[in-house]
Amino acid sequence: MNENQMKRIHTGKGFIAALDQSGGSTPKALLEYGIKENSYSNEDEMFGLVHEMRKRIIKSPAFTLEYILGAILFEDTMYRTIDNQYTPDYLWKEKNIVPFLKVDKGLTEIENGVQLMKPISNLDDLLKHAVEKNIFGTKMRSVIKEANAKGIKMLVNQQFEIGKQIVEAGLVPIIEPEVDIHSTDKEESEKLLKLEILEQLSKLDKETKVMLKLSIPTQDNFYIDLIDDPHVVRVVALSGGYSQAEAKERLGRNHGLIASFSRALSQGLTAQQTEEEFNGTISKSIKEIYEASIK
């Protein structure tokens, strides 16, 4: 593990950029970027176009270590290059931004009020490749729809079981049990979730380190004891469907919680913009998300 990267993620000022739209969400991301579905005829072309979008974001002069601590990449991006370097190497060597990899394969159907992760059949191989490509950590998402104690326990157990496998491979897992922001009992779900996470953290070996990616809590500063836990490198927040303005406003009220936004980061960016327009738009977004993250 790279100690410089660990120090940067643990104590640095800034946020984590989520650039990990997967195959399922890529058409929507491209559409928002101004590229219609008839612009590509197969998955390869689609991933090629989305890599160009990500490359444009990463290479932007606004995308700097001053504001951004890390970036979460989709598996396909890990194997692609920017200026003849693999994307993770470009991020760290050229930008001093720590690379993470999304490892989950999507969600199961809702059961017991939650959506667990689908089995990650190639996890060992994927982690091996991630280490070879100088990835620092991983991210995997599951979703809580209802305050169902049984479901939430199962979901957190699954996250930590896989998390331990990731730690053994020499990487830092971002554990992401998202609470659906539209859930009618969101606050109750958050209470159950925090209890389960605290229980799992208490069972970890002293040297085991994890990160958490959580929905912005209903009650401000509700996750402060997770932020202060010695096993937790950092707690980051997802925007979860809030608009950029609302996500930033809510985040700013939670001390020690930093952003890991994707939609809120790329909002307003289009393929048709000139470099000046593109860089101006993303610069404004980055600075505003950063300001909310350091409160």
UniProtKB/Swiss-Prot annotation:
Domain of life: Bacteria
Keywords associated with the record: Glycolysis, Lyase, Schiff base
Catalytic activity, reaction form: beta-D-fructose 1,6-bisphosphate = D-glyceraldehyde 3-phosphate + dihydroxyacetone phosphate
GO molecular function, one term: fructose-bisphosphate aldolase activity
Residues of the active site: E176 (proton acceptor), K213 (schiff-base intermediate with dihydroxyacetone-p)
Assigned EC number: 4.1.2.13
Pathway(s) where this gene product acts: Carbohydrate degradation; glycolysis; D-glyceraldehyde 3-phosphate and glycerone phosphate from D-glucose: step 4/4
One Pfam family, short name: Glycolytic
Any one GO BP annotation for this protein: glycolytic process
InterPro entries assigned: Aldolase_TIM, FBA_I, FBA_I_Gram+-type
Record-linked Gene3D superfamilies: Aldolase class I
Family: Belongs to the class I fructose-bisphosphate aldolase family.
Protein's recorded name: Fructose-bisphosphate aldolase class 1
Organism name: Clostridium beijerinckii (strain ATCC 51743 / NCIMB 8052) (Clostridium acetobutylicum)
Source organism phylogeny: Bacteria, Bacillati, Bacillota, Clostridia, Eubacteriales
